[in-house]
């Protein structure tokens, strides 16, 4: 089956199912912020990114920096589904000796382009990669996903100012805008609005879309690639914990315990939908 024939929403649901299984078998993890990014991961890995799972170090590949590194379980699910490593390894999430720590580590996991978890730093690394692409006239596109809670970090805005000033148009960023963070609602903790205007003021091309609609994600990236002379920010309006009744839209889903009954029921629901 060609990449154009792959049902991206189906792939997103499979990623969501695998994510629930790996966190569920461990018993605890970052459920909310992993389940909210399954659609963008499906679009990137199964349609948009120029990558080769059989040659993960390919110099001309596109890169993804998951700056909100606590979403690692979803990224691992996408990588396994794409063929970077066996799906069975997902059962080792965050266990002794694993190659799949709770937060992304480029030295331990094949397919991970940057170690992340200290909020704000991954985004800065992605900006640095995009600068290298520009300076060396390379064909790579650099993608990065940041969190809305992560957007409280001053380092995000320092990097945003630099990227806009340097006109890094090989950089496409996404914000997982689920309106929740570990301490509460983003609007109550540190209001981000007007978020679109903020990014435009820093010299970015900005779009705001449904982050759970794979067609909109693909279209937004295609439009971003046509925006010459500007880095692009795509605000993904998402729901934290999407796809499981015990986590969807719930603040407690940021990092939560899962019983076997909980995660198996959620997986069964996804399987009914064809995952």
Swiss-Prot record:
Entry's CDD domains?
TPP_TK
Q: What is its EC number?
A: 2.2.1.15
Annotated GO molecular function terms are: transferase activity
Q: Which UniProt keywords apply?
A: Carbohydrate metabolism, Thiamine pyrophosphate, Transferase
Matches recorded under Pfam families: Transketolase_N
Question: What cofactors does the UniProt entry give for this protein?
Answer: thiamine diphosphate
- Which top-rank group of organisms is this from? Bacteria
Top-tier EC class: transferase
Reaction(s) catalysed by this chain, per the record, are:
6-deoxy-6-sulfo-D-fructose + D-glyceraldehyde 3-phosphate = 4-deoxy-4-sulfo-D-erythrose + D-xylulose 5-phosphate; 4-deoxy-4-sulfo-D-erythrulose + D-glyceraldehyde 3-phosphate = sulfoacetaldehyde + D-xylulose 5-phosphate
Q: Which SUPFAM superfamilies match?
A: Thiamin diphosphate-binding fold (THDP-binding) (SSF52518)
Which family would the database say this protein is a member of? Belongs to the transketolase family.
Function, as annotated, reads: Part of the sulfo-TK pathway, a D-sulfoquinovose degradation pathway that produces 2-hydroxyethane-1-sulfonate (isethionate). Catalyzes two steps of the pathway: the formation of 4-deoxy-4-sulfoerythrose (SE) and xylulose 5-phosphate from 6-deoxy-6-sulfo-D-fructose (SF) and glyceraldehyde 3-phosphate, and the formation of sulfoacetaldehyde (SA) and xylulose 5-phosphate from 4-deoxy-4-sulfo-D-erythrulose (SEu) and glyceraldehyde 3-phosphate.
Q: How does it assemble?
A: Forms a complex with SqwH.
Fetch the PANTHER family from UniProt.
Answer: TRANSKETOLASE N-TERMINAL SECTION-RELATED
Q: What is this protein called?
A: 6-deoxy-6-sulfo-D-fructose transketolase subunit SqwG
What is the scientific name of the source organism?
A: Clostridium sp. (strain MSTE9)
